[in-house]
Amino acid sequence: MNQILVTEKLYITPELKRKKKIYKFYFILSVFIVLILTSFYIYAEYDRNKSAEVSQQLLDDMNKTLEGTTEDTTIAQDDVLLVVLNGTKEETQQEEQQNQQEQQSMVTTANEKAEWKTSAAGYKYKIIATVEVPKISLKYTVVQGQSGSIEETESLLKSSPVKYHGYDPNEVGNFCIVGHNYRNSKFFSKVPNLTVGDTVKLTDLTGRTINYEVYDKHTVDPSDTKDTTQLTGGRKELTLITCTDDSKLRVIVRCKEVK
C-alpha cells in the first residue's frame, strides 16, 4: 500500500508541475485572445450598423430635398419633346443644347445651395446625388467632402459613397464615385458582381435621373488613376470604384449614359 502511494507521488514531478503551469497560461491567454477578437468583431458590426443608419438618414434627407423638383424637370423634358415634334432638325439641336446648358446651370446652382453638414468626426460634407443599382438592390446618397483630402474621404466613406473625381453629377465628363466593400450587402460590397449591360441610375439635386449602362469592368492597382480621366468625347459617364475582397486591388466599373 505504501509502495503504491510512493509510486503515485513519483509521477508529480517538478517538470510536470511546470508544464501544467505553462498549459494553464496558454489556456488563459487563448481565452483572452478570443474575448479580444470577439470584442473587435462586435464593435466592427456595431460600427457598420451605425454607418448604415447614418446612410439611411442621408437618403431620407436627399428624398426631402428632391420633393417638388420632379415636376420642374418633367416640364423641361416636355419642352424638348415639343421642339422635336414642331421644329426643324437644326432648331431641335439648338434647343437641346440650350436645354442641356440650362440643366447644367440648375445642377450647379442646386449643388452650390446644398446644405453643408458635419460628420461625427468633424468633417464638412454635403449630399449631391443618389446612386441606385437595381440588380444588386443598391441605393445610397453620394456625398462630397469640403476639402477632398484623403483623411476626409476615408472618414466619410464609413457613412456613404463619396464623390472621388469629376464634374457635377449627370453632366458631361466622368463622375467618379468611391464606396467601401464591407464583404456583405452594405455600400459597394456587391458592385464587383456587376456585369456589362447592367443599369446604374444617378439622380442629381434637381430631381433628374439618368440611366447609365455598364460597358467595362476590370481591376487595377490602388495607385492607378487612369479610369478617372475626364476625356469622354463629350459623353456623360459614371465610374464606380471599390476594392476587391482582399483589398489588394481596386474594382473599376465604367458606365455610359443610355440615350
Task: For each feature predicted by the language model, list its residue ranges.
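Solvent-exposed, non-transmembrane regions of membrane-associated and secreted proteins
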Residues: 15, 19-259
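N-terminal Lys/Arg-rich, disordered targeting/topogenic segments
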Residues: 1-22
